[in-house]
Structures are given as structure tokens and as C-alpha cells.
């Protein structure tokens, strides 16, 4: 809350000082006269044309945008499909069971190997 108040105060003070920097009377000569900038010669080329950046306007392909939007909608609907979610759940469950069975087999193999070593030692 304090930060907001401080920012509002700083902005208000800035506007207040910039608003009173120049007098607004008609007699005052403090205003800036209209004229060319001293460095305006830098922006003119040999053909007396101004050197401005040119920005190419993008050609909008509405069909492509439409296809993209329908593709996003299609992906969202696929994610919400309960049948797909159930299939995914059972696939993940089968993978987990396979990993657990592999770990149990490895544990059994380790126990078998340890028993064999123990029996040979005795």
C-alpha cells in the first residue's frame, strides 16, 4: 500500500512540475518555435527523401489462422475426452505393473544369488 502511495505521489509531483515549467501567457516568449531540428540534415539522403524505417505489413492468412484455431480447439477437446483418459490411465497402470514386476524379479534374482553364495560358503 505504501509503495502505491509513493508512486502516486511521485507521478503527481512530476506532472505538477512539468505543467508549471513553461508559462502559458501570450506575452511569454518561452515557448519553442516551430522549425527544423539542427540534426535534421542527417535524416535526408541524396534524393532529398527522408530516411525512415520501413515496416512491411504482414499479409494475414485467415485460412491458416482458422486452421490453427480449430487445431487448438480439437486438441482441447481431445484432452477432455473421458474415453481417452480411461485408456491412458490403464496404459499407465499396465506400465507401472510391469515396472513393479521387473523390480520384484530383480529382487528375487538377488535373493537367489545371495542364497547360492551363502550355501556355497557353508
Curated annotation (Swiss-Prot):
UniProt short sequence motif RxLR-dEER, positions renumbered to this chain: 50-68
Keyword set includes Secreted: yes
InterPro entries from the UniProt entry: RXLR
Induction annotation: Expression is strongly up-regulated during the early stages of infection.
Disulfide bonds: none
Record region (TAP1-binding): 69-86
Signal peptide (from-to): 1-21
Keywords, comma-separated and alphabetical: Host nucleus, Secreted, Signal, Virulence
GO (cellular component) term, any one: host cell nucleus
Region (Nuclear localization signal (NLS)): 87-98
Keyword DNA-binding: no
Disrupted-gene phenotype: Leads to smaller lesions on soybean seedlings.
Family as reported in the entry's similarity comment: Belongs to the RxLR effector family.
Record's subunit section: Interacts with host acetyl transferase TAP1.
Role description: Effector that suppresses plant defense responses during the early stages of pathogen infection. Suppresses cell death induced by effectors and PAMPs in plant hosts. Interacts with host acetyltransferase TAP1 and causes TAP1 relocation into the nucleus where it acetylates histones H2A and H3 during early infection, thereby promoting susceptibility of host plant to P.sojae.
UniProt name for this protein: RxLR effector protein Avh52
Species the sequence originates in: Phytophthora sojae
